[in-house]
């Protein structure tokens, strides 16, 4: 087995058998996908009293669901970066931050071109929080719905989720708590 070039061998690492996650990193963060994973898969559960988070038209691709483009300063992800003292010039893109689930779930449904029929006249990742009727970013609504214990669904039109096999389109939706 190759040990790699000299530069590779000079990289300083912890001598551990398990990766030591850097809690301060905004690029790579330990994902929650395997936390509390049951030994056996859970069966299907009935979804009751769910609210739609988005009602989308036709041709909403994985690029709409999980954008790879620039991160807006005035967004839930921008707020997350401000909390972590990251300057806007260093936000980079969603594509470069795929190793951080906190960034990626905030970016889910945040494509600047996505149109949610629940929030007419808006573009770019907004929804309407019910029963208040307040228009807000999708992630912010999810936080409120989680506090209330509200099940969420997304209603997609023809060819919803088609496109490149971007894993974050599925993972981000799951992390937001969308049931169907």
Residue ranges: model-predicted function:
Residues 1-180:
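Fe-S-dependent hydro-lyases/dehydratases of central metabolism
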């Amino acid at each position: 087995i190759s040990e790699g070039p000299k530069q590779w061998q000079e990289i300083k690492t912890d001598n551990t058998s398990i990766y030591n996650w850097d809690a301060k990193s905004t690029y790579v963060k330990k994902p929650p996908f395997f936390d509390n994973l049951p030994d056996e898969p859970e069966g299907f559960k009935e979804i009751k009293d769910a609210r739609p988070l988005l009602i989308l038209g036709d041709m909403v691709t994985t690029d709409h669901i999980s954008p790879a483009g620039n991160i807006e300063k005035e967004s839930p992800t921008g707020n997350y970066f401000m909390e972590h003292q990251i300057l806007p010039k260093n936000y980079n893109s969603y594509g470069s931050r795929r190793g951080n689930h906190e960034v990626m779930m905030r970016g889910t449904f945040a494509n600047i071109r996505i149109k949610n029929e629940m929030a007419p006249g808006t573009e770019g990742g907004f929804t309407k929080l019910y029963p208040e009727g307040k228009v807000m970013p999708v992630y912010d609504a999810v936080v409120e719905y989680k506090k209330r214990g509200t099940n969420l669904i997304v209603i997609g039109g023809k060819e919803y989720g088609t496109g490149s096999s971007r894993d974050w389109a599925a993972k981000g939706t799951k992390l937001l708590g969308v049931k169907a």
